[in-house]
Amino acid sequence: MRDGFIKVAAVTPKVVVADPVENTIRIKAAVMEAAANGAKVIVCPELCITGYTCGDLFLQETLLRSARERLVWLAKELGALDAVVFVGLPLMHEGKLYNVAAALNKGEIIGIVPKTHIPNYNEFYEARYFSPGKEEAEGVDIAPAYHVPMGSHILFQCDDVLPELVIGVEICEDVWTPNPPSISHALAGATLIVNLSASDETTGKDIYRRELVAGQSARLLCGYIYASAGDGESTQDVVYSGHNIIAENGVVLAESERFTNETVYSEIDMERLVSERRRMSTFAAGSRSEDYLRFSFFIDKSDTTLSRFVDPAPFVPGNKGKRDKRCEEILAIQSMGLKKRLEHTRCKCAVVGISGGLDSTLALLVTVQAFDRLKLPREQIYAVTMPGFGTTDRTYENALSLIRCLGAKLIEVDIKEAVRIHFRDIGQDESVHDVTYENGQARERTQILMDIANKNNGMVIGTGDMSELALGWATYNGDHMSMYGVNVSVPKTLVRHLVHYYADTCGNKELSTVLYDVLDTPVSPELLPPENGKIAQKTEDIVGPYELHDFYLYYVMRFGFAPAKIYRLAQVAFAGQYDNAVILKWLKTFYRRFFSQQFKRSCLPDGPKVGTVAVSPRGDLRMPSDASVRIWMDEIEHLK
């Protein structure tokens, strides 16, 4: 349960139709195996104690009595199990038969939830036997000493070790309807929905089922466990595939191979779900819990080993097709944002500083797209290259080639002499390569860009990316400042893919060659003199790998996770790539710089938001510039 993770399982025992004795023996074995594998929430299919396909045998008292007796037997047999288990059965109460899910924990039947929506169409004819369940809870006598609450408005909460875990139940058809019970469950506080199902298999139904479960988990910001009937059910008219699904907020974490009765496992991140709900004020505004009852279940505190995939590049889709689509979309957002700003200001000239590095390259590509959308000539893009003390031949030549290939107007201003004069004016020794030496060059370049823009009634286009802004890796009032920053919410790991996508799709071989070489060039501000003609100042040697910092940024900003949890996730994501000492070193650097450099982000120029994470002080990050990082650093100091 550490860090809010809970391991769950969807189980499909092979049933024998109308044999509760054999079925409960098999359920016990399957549940015990799932628990042995660490599952703490275990879900079995709809009516699994009897089998779903009993037909008119559901009207036989012998079957109903046996199902009830075997439920009690199963609860006792699983008494020592450290888990909460959900099983399905038919249950008579006050003259009506209900299709129910029973929750078992520590030898007790802690609650019963009836099915709300009873299908009676096509191959389904449940209304022949079952009645819709009531919302309000009422007591049901299952057996002596087993007086159990039953109702659809019941939630089960893990009070002791993981209070964020609140479970709501729906049964099969319930989720296929326009108004699933899980909606009101979630608004009443349920963070995990379990669905005991018997969904038969027809061509293409698995795709719809998967999207339905994933979509419901996204809509409700919850985890969702879907356990469906499989092999063993009657095939008189239909076939059941045992299609089990575990989803979390729109993402399928685990899914069984159909027709195998496979148990699937995953860990659901309850803290992540609670974080999402905390941020979405409209979710809380719709909450309603006054008519719900909560019953506690208990599991022992334990450390959950993570088997779920942790993406080392959360900003970048792993699938090439999805990645290309994302890149196309982001370039469109960036260029449309700039297009609107140029239209509003009636600027027909843009000024971009071109270094031959990734960020300025992307900014120029976006500016070109904006001008093309406006049907303005590219010659009105003033691409300014400003060689300084650290400029290498490679970046200089790439800058010139890039400008030429894109058809922008080249302006070259060598800043070395102007900076030397400035150093003399302020008494700076040129041989002392300190922060003044570096920032003096950055501010000189910004001054040149601003003045060229003023001279030509133009707009300075900012090049800095979100990763640099998160770390404060920008000169205040130097490259930090512009009139519109097109890269302001694009992380460095994504910048690389955007440029690569453009190179792959532009259809210009010469331009592609230049872009590929830019991609191959080490990231550097080039403010220190080169060594033997090569870049001496490499950003990632100084502040750390951007793939780590983007990973940290994502989980800090997107979910507000604590350092310990982010460290744990990074260990999983970067296993075999970075050792723990390296991950921890740069995690410290990230937090220290993220807090100390907020003053730079507090006065950022406008720029378009492209993803769920952004650092604009007017939108996503309203953080005080003088906040203390102490408690975060204290937590990091205790990590190993």
Pin down the residues of each PLM region:
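Enzyme catalytic cores with a strong preference for nitrogen-chemistry domains
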Residues: 1-351, 369-378, 410
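ATP/NTP-dependent adenylation/nucleotidyl-transfer catalytic domains that generate, transfer
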Residues: 163-165, 222, 234, 248, ...
